[in-house]
Amino acid sequence: MGYVINIQAIKKQIELSPQSCGVYQMIGDKDKVLYVGKAKNLKSRLSNYLRYENLSERTKFMLSQVIKVEVLVTENEIDALLLEARLIKSLKPPYNIIFKDGRSYPYIVISKHNYPRIAQYRGKFKKGEFHYYGPFISVAAVKQTMLSLQKTFLLRVCSDQYFASTKRPCIEYQIKRCSAPCVGKITKDDYCQSVKQTRDTLLGRNEKVKKQLSSTMEKCSKEENYELAAIYRDRLKFLEQIQMQSMDFSFEKDADFFGIARKEDLACIGVLSFRNKDNYGSTPYFVENCSDHPDDEILSTFLIKLYNSANIPPAQIYVSDFVTGKEIIEQALHNVTHKPIKALHAKSKKEHNLLKFVYDNSQRSLEQKLTDYKNNLEKFEELSKIFLLPNIPKRVEVYDNSHTSGNQQVGVMVVAGKEGFLKSEYRKFTIKGEILGDDYEMMREVLTRRFSNNTKDVVPDFLLIDGGPGHISVVQNVLNTLNINVPFACMAKGSYRNAGNERFYMPNREDFTLKNDSKVMLYLQSLRNEAHRFAITSHRKKRDKQFFVSPLSKITSIGDKRKNALMSHFGSVENISKASLAEIQNVARISKELAEVILKHVDNKE
């Protein structure tokens, strides 16, 4: 395919560019930055764009939109690497390498509460709220470890709000994953001992915890308290399961191992993480549109992005021998993390085996991802034919609403692409209008808010609406008013509101149905079901939040931060009512007068 490229704009900048380090920007219409790149030699790097026959189709298409090129000269390669990362993060150029699942590592946290809870956490550290353990590279590893810890130590996972207001044990107690401190099924001292043992386990002190559990079990047996002894026996068994999860691989030092596999225009970077001598799991990160970039460059950019956030890097990372610029990576990571980090090649047999393991996993993940891409592309091709779309869709948005008799009304949007469901792009809309359960008006508000303001630059290729023929005019009216040209269809369930025999409604077209067992019908049902699931869970969260309202929420003279501090410290409104004025003043850092207002309020349960 031929593209018209503004050769003169590139040649002009080549003439002006020095043979030194820096960053260049490809700029298109309306000064939109299309691409940001770094180079050891700006003149040489830009000259490569004139070798047209060596460029990928994607790069050729990008160059056809370039109006001008700008460069920023830096002192050295490290500054160029960091500047490129900052510009990509702030400008989000559409033609730069896309890293998927570039979120921060997940952690396990234990709250600083009188009866601490254990939870999965991802994001910036909140000083004073939690003890953090990790990071874990894999979310699956966090969930598995959490489950084992719950079975072993029976810590609560409920919110502080629920803990303070509940009157009876929840399902977690019934299935033996919680000791129900909320209703006094365990003493505070015993619960705190369980918390301490959990923390020791997460810090790698498993042998210490095993000795404590064994000693307690033997003591219970001698006292002929066989029921309690059996409980500690089960705890020991679960603790051994936790240890077995990391027996296949271990490493003496905190370290991350990186491997990269490539095929077609996709790369997969695998990360294997060790903390406190334990294997914290691995996860694949996918890199799209990278055919024009060498492995060395992809990995360098990825490392800066990975550790330039809430992620806490280890003192050393291991990379394959193909990575030649180790010193540059070390200096760049030091600049963004303010910690000395060594980039190492494998030397010992164990190090080589771990690098091979992470590479092999990356290769398998890459093959699976490409298979998923192919399958989803086939589904999108079918959608294009059935709904007479102008192009094969790349982004499909599905909409649904949920409410209970007009209360806690929410609308949701789920997104699907060639990768599958794009959960990071889901949105939920709390209905603001006085609509009272009118599905049509709820959909009108949701779509109006979705396509207004700054969201027009992310326009989908197809909309699927959970609704019937009555929704057609509503959707069409919103899109016409906002000058949005997107094809859509409404999907209504069959006669008895069950899956199967769904009918589809579109503007200026007779309604139709599809074979129930066809692949495309099953795919459309999965899209609708995912939107329905997200709508229901969003609605329930909103409903439950309203149900579990603390009496403190009615006090307008103190803010949420102080209310949370009081609930976190005392555990319940009842405990606050028993506290002294001085205690309340100290915890919430408020005046005596305001403390008196709080006590009066919780005593009267106003």
Swiss-Prot record:
Q: Which InterPro entries match?
A: GIY-YIG_endonuc, GIY-YIG_endonuc_sf, GIY-YIG_UvrC_Cho, RuvA_2-like, UVR_dom, UVR_dom_sf, UvrABC_protein_C, UvrC
Source organism superkingdom: Bacteria
Q: Tell me which residues make up the UVR domain.
A: 207-242
Q: Name one GO cellular component term.
A: excinuclease repair complex
Any GO BP annotation: SOS response
Mainly localized where?
cytoplasm
Subcellular location per the Swiss-Prot or TrEMBL entry: Cytoplasm
Q: What does this protein do?
A: The UvrABC repair system catalyzes the recognition and processing of DNA lesions. UvrC both incises the 5' and 3' sides of the lesion. The N-terminal half is responsible for the 3' incision and the C-terminal half is responsible for the 5' incision.
The molecule here is called UvrABC system protein C
Origin species: Wolbachia sp. subsp. Brugia malayi (strain TRS)
